[in-house]
């Protein structure tokens, strides 16, 4: 794990100190011997990489993974944000307090949901090695609810199953998970699934190859979302009890809002939470999912820094980035996220008519060529879990290879945020009204 510094990105460079992970004593592999894999994103050799790409690879090899397989051939194309995303993923996978069988069950559930063949193959083996029964793995592979789960696993299964299939979490399920694993456990479960959603998107868009001689395991499911079909979020379950707390970190005041995650005052925070809050207050504030993120100061800080990069330092035009964000918020039915970014989308040049069409589940008319390329790319992913050759070529032609990755990471980051907000039932802002209605089918 690297030492975190609050300002990760200045002038497009990664500025972070390197410290050996506490659980690593072996020398990191030689990066010059690294062999990356990919299809649409052609693998790079270490000597061909930019300084920022080499930094990302060095961090991966020195960290818990000690390698760069899977999504990193893709994320390497935008290394500043890819480096932060990898650290968030490392916190969720390796530095959580969750039991290993629960961690691997959540990962294969997410891989099954997104039909990510490489991810499934890798973590199916890890699940079995960590004590997940073969019958449970097989049930998840075929889209069935497993029987014979231990209570502590069933609790986690219910949370992720509800979140992926309804895009919401019931009161009973939230309470059961919180009582067993605490608020940090809830954050880590949702964050873990969200991270592997980004992993799935990276792998599937790249068409990442399976190991030689290994056929894909997962068959298409007739109904991968049994509750809502291929639709968006169901209505928010239960009675909402939003709360708002105003507090101060030193001389600077801040506000935190939430529902199931009751906002903390500064005095209620642990030293690690205070440190994270001090950084946030000095930068972009404590709005949105921050009240949830602070429950895990390690993973939450990396997610905060990843969000800073996504929000302010991407290479794609703001209009196309905001289009990606509101499409993601619409898919997840994330009311707070939608309201925050619908205005930003209009300010960036997307017309009110197009934003309204997306809110209502209609394909916007009169899109420009660049808007249509991005719209097709994001909606096709949410509908099919893939990107066709034509769609991939069109969006790459508009934004370039790095731009494609910036769109993937933007969708992936705001998907994580949407999942966290929906789990909390984060209330919309004062004086605002929810705009998104339940949709029974995806955007055309």
Where are these regions (language model features)?
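Positively charged n-region of N-terminal signal peptides that target proteins for export
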Residues: 1-4
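Hydrophobic helical h-region of N-terminal Sec-dependent signal peptides
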Residues: 6-14
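Hydrophobic alpha-helical segments
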Residues: 18-444
């Amino acid at each position: 794990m690297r030492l975190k510094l609050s300002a990760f990105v200045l002038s497009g460079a990664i500025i972070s100190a390197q410290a050996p992970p506490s659980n690593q004593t072996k020398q990191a592999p030689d990066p010059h011997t690294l062999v990356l894999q990919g299809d649409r994103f052609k693998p790079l050799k270490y000597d061909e990489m930019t300084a920022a790409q080499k930094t990302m690879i060095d961090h991966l090899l020195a960290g818990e993974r000690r390698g760069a397989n899977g999504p990193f051939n893709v994320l390497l194309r935008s290394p500043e944000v890819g480096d932060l995303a990898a650290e968030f993923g490392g916190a969720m996978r390796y530095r959580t307090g969750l039991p290993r069988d629960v961690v691997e069950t959540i990962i294969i559930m997410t891989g099954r949901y997104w039909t990510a063949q490489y991810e499934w193959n890798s973590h199916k083996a890890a699940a079995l090695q960590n004590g997940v029964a073969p019958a449970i793995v097989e049930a998840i592979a075929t889209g069935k609810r497993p029987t014979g789960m231990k209570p502590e696993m069933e609790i986690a299964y219910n949370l992720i199953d509800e979140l992926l299939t309804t895009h919401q979490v019931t009161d009973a399920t939230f309470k059961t998970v919180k009582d067993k694993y605490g608020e940090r456990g809830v954050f880590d479960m949702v964050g873990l699934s969200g991270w592997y959603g980004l992993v799935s998107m990276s792998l599937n868009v790249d068409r990442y190859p399976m190991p030689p001689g290994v056929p894909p395991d997962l068959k298409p499911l007739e109904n991968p979302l049994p509750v809502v079909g291929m639709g968006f979020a169901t209505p928010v379950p239960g009675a909402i009890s939003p709360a708002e707390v105003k507090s101060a970190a030193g001389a600077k005041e801040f506000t935190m809002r939430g529902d199931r995650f009751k906002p903390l005052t500064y005095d209620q925070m642990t030293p690690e939470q205070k440190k994270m809050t001090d950084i946030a207050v000095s930068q972009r504030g404590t709005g949105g999912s921050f009240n949830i993120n602070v429950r895990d100061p390690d993973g939450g800080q990396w997610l905060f820094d990843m969000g800073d990069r996504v929000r302010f330092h991407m290479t794609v035009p703001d209009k196309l980035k905001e289009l990606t964000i509101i499409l993601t918020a619409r898919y997840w039915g994330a009311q707070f996220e939608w309201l925050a970014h619908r205005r930003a989308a209009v300010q960036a040049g997307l017309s009110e008519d197009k934003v309204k069409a997306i809110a209502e589940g209609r394909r916007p008319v009169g899109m420009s060529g660049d808007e249509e390329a991005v719209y097709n790319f994001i909606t096709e992913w949410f509908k099919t879990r893939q990107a066709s050759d034509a769609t991939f070529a069109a969006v790459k032609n508009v934004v370039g290879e790095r731009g494609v990755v910036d769109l993937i990471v933007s969708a992936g980051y705001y998907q994580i945020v949407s999942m966290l907000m929906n789990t909390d039932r984060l209330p919309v802002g004062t004086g605002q009204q929810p705009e998104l209605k339940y949709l029974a089918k995806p955007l055309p």
